[in-house]
């Protein structure tokens, strides 16, 4: 498994996106240290805001980092 994973939630609803990210976090093995969530930004900030708010205090997430573009958010994972 890669140490870095990418998840594209562009065309998802907020509920679908949260479900997909939660599943990705559950599947993330010991070698995964970062999940890049691609939420986009041209269609609004609902997904971006939901990702950043929900996962800022998630037990598996060490910190949130801004991605390389405004349409990405990186979840840096804790070593559990």
Which stretches of residues belong to each language-model region?
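Long, charged, low-complexity intrinsically disordered regions
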Residues: 1-80
């Amino acid at each position: 498994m890669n140490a870095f994973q990418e998840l594209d939630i562009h065309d998802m609803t907020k509920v679908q996106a949260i479900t997909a990210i939660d599943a990705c976090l559950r599947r993330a093995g010991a070698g995964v240290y970062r999940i890049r969530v691609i939420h986009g930004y041209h269609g609004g900030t609902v997904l971006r805001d939901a990702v950043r708010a929900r996962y800022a205090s998630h037990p598996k997430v060490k910190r949130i980092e801004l991605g390389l573009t405004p349409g990405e958010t990186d979840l840096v994972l804790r070593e559990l």
